[in-house]
């Protein structure tokens, strides 16, 4: 999560009881026939020491093999071989989600991020979705006719997703942080439960890594324009 300098946030530490039995252990004690997944089915996280997965899925594991920076993961790694052989498809393995809650002017914020990424990351091939907005069930039920101060938060939120290749993830991550921290605080507001507004909008950035490559048609991709 990125916030404006000086904005205080709470840090919570959780102490885990290491003596607590696992769920599978408890179920087995109740007579359930449970079997845990073998460690050999798990992939080393972003490692180059080799893959622990067995069988066909271990061949050319995207986490353990070097990535072609220009073209992304080799097409032999793509699960859908029809897409792998089709040059009209671009392959991604990393996803960023930009999220914010109860923000006024949220469309403008994500439009700004999208426009900045298009220009500042022109040498990389990425895919960027439009902004999606979601509301809680409470906000849907209360109706639009009721006016006045709100008694509960609406939990209205936005999400925007950016797909890229793992080799480019550090550049996407750094640029997202830069454009979010460069926001003008008076331009974006968040609404409190009592209806008042504040010029500080927390923006959350989550990063996900895919085990299987995601393929998108090039019509939906912002392609590398460094050569133009």
UniProtKB/Swiss-Prot annotation:
Keyword set includes Phosphoprotein: yes
Annotated GO CC locations: host cell nucleus
Pfam families: Herpes_UL3 (PF03369)
Keywords per UniProt: Host nucleus, Phosphoprotein
Mod. after translation: Phosphorylated.
Protein family per UniProt: Belongs to the alphaherpesvirinae HHV-1 UL3 family.
Identification of the protein by name: Nuclear phosphoprotein UL3 homolog
Native species: Gallid herpesvirus 2 (strain Chicken/Md5/ATCC VR-987)
Lineage: Viruses, Duplodnaviria, Heunggongvirae, Peploviricota, Herviviricetes
């Amino acid at each position: 999560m990125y916030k404006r300098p000086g904005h205080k946030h709470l840090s919570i530490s959780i102490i885990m009881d290491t003596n607590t039995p696992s769920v599978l252990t408890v179920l087995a004690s109740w007579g359930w026939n449970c079997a845990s997944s073998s460690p050999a089915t798990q992939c080393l996280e972003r490692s180059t020491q080799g893959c622990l997965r067995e069988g066909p899925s271990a061949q050319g594991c995207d986490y353990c093999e070097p990535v072609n920076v220009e073209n992304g993961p080799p097409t032999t790694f793509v699960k859908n071989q029809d897409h792998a052989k089709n040059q009209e498809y671009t392959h991604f393995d990393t996803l960023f989600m930009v999220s914010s809650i109860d923000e006024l002017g949220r469309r403008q914020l994500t439009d700004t991020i999208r426009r900045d990424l298009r220009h500042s990351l022109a040498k990389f091939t990425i895919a960027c979705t439009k902004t999606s907005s979601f509301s809680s069930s409470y906000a849907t039920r209360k109706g639009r006719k009721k006016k006045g101060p709100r008694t509960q938060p609406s939990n209205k939120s936005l999400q925007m997703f950016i797909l890229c290749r793992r080799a480019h993830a550090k550049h996407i991550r750094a640029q997202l942080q830069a454009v979010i921290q460069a926001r003008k605080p008076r331009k974006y507001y968040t609404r409190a439960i009592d209806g008042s507004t504040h010029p500080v909008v927390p923006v959350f950035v989550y990063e996900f890594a895919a085990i299987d490559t995601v393929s998108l048609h090039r019509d939906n991709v912002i392609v590398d324009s460094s050569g133009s």
